[in-house]
Amino acid sequence: MDRQWHPETFAEAVDLLFQVLDEETLEIFAGRTAEELKFYHATAGELIKIHYRLAGGNPSLLHECRKISGKPDLDGEQAAIYILETFWARLQMGKG
């Protein structure tokens, strides 16, 4: 499995966004409010779902997203959004 684009843990999934996004993109996300972040669910969330294989092919990451979120029925799309929102929250705290 290509670990670069297919992280197996939730921490790897969030950390990978900090590694692959350029400084300008990080600043754009950091400058968004929680309400504005919702506009990125359909775009960035979809890319995360595809590249992290959350729609199928990466059951370990999906399982961990369910466990950490406390939502056992989380699907691939919801898991991608959860990863995106956690990434955004870390940006807000300056923990990138």
Enumerate the language-model features and the residues they cover.
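N-terminal secretory signal peptides
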Residues: 1-31
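Compact alpha-helical subdomains of small soluble proteins
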Residues: 23-96
